[in-house]
Amino acid sequence: MLRSFLARSCAVALLGLAAAGPAAAQSNIRGDATGPTTAPGFSHPEQYMHLTPVKPAPNMYPVIQHPDLEKNAADKLAALAEKTGKKPNILIFLLDDVGWMDPGFNGGGVSVGNATPEMDKIAAEGLILTSAYSTPSCSPTRATIHTGQNPLHHGILRPPMYGEPGGLDGALTMPKLLKDAGYVTQGVGKWHMGENQGSLPQNVGYDDYVGFLGVSDMYTEWRDIYFNPEVALSPERFKMMQEDNFNHYEVHCTPADTQKCENGKLIDLDYIKDLDKHWLETSLAFLDKMKGGTKPFYLYHATRGCHFDNYPSDEWAGKSMARTVYSDCLVHMDYVFGQLMKKLEDIGEAENTLVIFTSDNGPECEIPPSGRTPFRGCKGSSWEGGVRVPTFVYWKDMIAPRKSDQLFDLADILPTALSLAGYPGAKLAELFPKKTYIDGVDQTPFLVADDGLSTRRSRIYTLNQYYAAIRIDEFKGVVTGEIEDGIVQKGNIGGFSGSIFTDTGGGVVFNLYTNPQEDVSIGIRHIPMAVPLGSAAGDYMKVLFEYPPQFKVGFLSNNPPLYDVIPEGEMAIKAWLKKHGFGRFQP
C-alpha cells in the first residue's frame, strides 16, 4: 500500500509540475489571458491550500500560525484570569451516535421531528463548527479526545466489546494532564475505553467517575426478546451472557481503589431508561460543589443517548414529533444539555468555562431508527457522514457568535484545553514522551480571538487500520474507501457490514462544497488540487514511519499492508497475538 500510494502521489505531483509550465500569461479559446483575477471576492483568507504549516515541535502536527490572533486570544485570556483568579474550566458534552443534521442548528431539529431548542440557543451564542471531525466509531473517538491522537497513534482502532482487553492502558491523557495542572477532574457517563485495570477512569486521571464501562447494547441486546430472542428466551444462553466476563453494572470509580470500580445498580432494560437522568443529577451535583471554588474544573459528560438501544422513560417517551425512540432520546438530551448550561449560570461559572458540544461519530444507519446526515456514509465509515459531527463551542463573552467551515478535529480538544491550562504550542510537547506524536493542534486562536481562524491546514481520516483520506480546504483526497459489495443484501449503508475496503487509483479527489455526497471525483481534471493533497498525505506517511501505528484494539482479520510495511506496526500486532492469541479475547 505504501509503495503504491507514494508512487501515485509522486506521479500526480509530477503531472502537476509538468502542467504548470512557464509562468508567462497564455491565451486560449475562452478569451483573455489566464491568471488570477483582481476581483477581491475571490480571495478567502480562511483557505490554506497555498500556505505551508509549521510544526510547533518535532512530535506535533503542523499548524498555520496567526501571530496577531494568538496575541489577541492571549490578551483576552489574561484579562479573564485577572478577573476570575483561576484558569478556565473545561466542559465536554459528548453525545453518542448523533448525526450532523439531527440538531436544529445544523438544519435538523423541528424539521426532522426532534426539536432541540436548548442546543440551538447555546449554539447561536457560540462558534458553530460545520467541519468538525470525529473518527468513524465511538471508542476511537473517545480515545482521540482523551489523548490528542488519531486512532493509528493511540491504537484503539475499534470499540472493545464484552470485556475485551485493550484500551487507554498506558496512555497519557487530558484528565491526567489537567489534574497535574491543578484541575478537579470529574467524568460522568459512557466510558468504553477499556475495562482492564490500567484503562479504568481513576487510573487515567479522573478524581471521580460515575457511569458504565461499556456501551448501551452490551447491556440490552441479549436481554430483549425482540432483538435477540435466540438468546433472551434461552435459559442456557441467557445465563451464558449473565456470566460473561464484562462489567454489567453502573460503576463509581475513584483513586481510592485503583484495582477496580465500585459496582452500583445492575443495568437492565428498566434501569437503562434512567441512566441519563441519574448522570445529569451527578454532573449537576458536581457543578454545585464547584461553586465558589478556587480550583478550575474539568467535566466530561458523555451521554448514554442516543446509541441503540434506546428505551425512553415514561417522562420522555413520545415527546418528539417524530415519535421514534431515537428522536425521543434526542429531545431528552436537549433537556440534559440545557440543564447543565443553566447550572453553569447559577453557580457563576459560565464566563469562565469553555463548553465543547459534539458527537462521537455519525449516525448508526444499520440500526433504525437512527440519526440523520446530509453526507455520504454513516457510523463506521470514513465518508463524511461517518465522521463529520454536529459541533459547537461556547464560552460566554469570550467566543463571538458565528459559524465556520474551517477544519476542527476532536483531537484538537486536548491541545486547546492544555493551552488554556498554561501549556500552549510547543510547551505541550514537553509534557509528553518524545516518541509520542500529538495529532491535535491548539485551536485557541480560532476559538477565542476576535475573528479567529483555524490553525489546522489539513485533516487525516483513518478507518480501522487504514490511512483513508486527507482534507485541505474543501478538497478531500481518498486513498482507501469503502465500496458496496454483495456480502449482504443491501450492500454498504455506511457501517461495519456490507462493505469492503479498497485502495483508490490515486486520483480520487472530491470537492466537498459542490459534491458533499462524494460520488464525483474531480482529481484528473483538477490535478493542481491533487498535488498539495498528495504532498501532505506523503508527509504524514513519513510521520507514521517515525511514530509508528499502535494496535490495542482492532480487527485482526482486517490487517492492511500499512501495518506490514512499517516494522514497528507489524510488531504491535504480533505482540498482541503473542499475549492474547486469536478468537474471543478475554481480559
What does each model-found stretch correspond to?
Residues 1-11:
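Bacterial N-terminal signal peptides that target proteins for export
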Residues 9-20:
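Bacterial N-terminal signal peptides
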Residues 21-25:
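Sec/Tat signal peptide C-region and signal peptidase I cleavage site
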Residues 26-502, 507, 512, 516-542, ...:
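Formylglycine-dependent sulfatase
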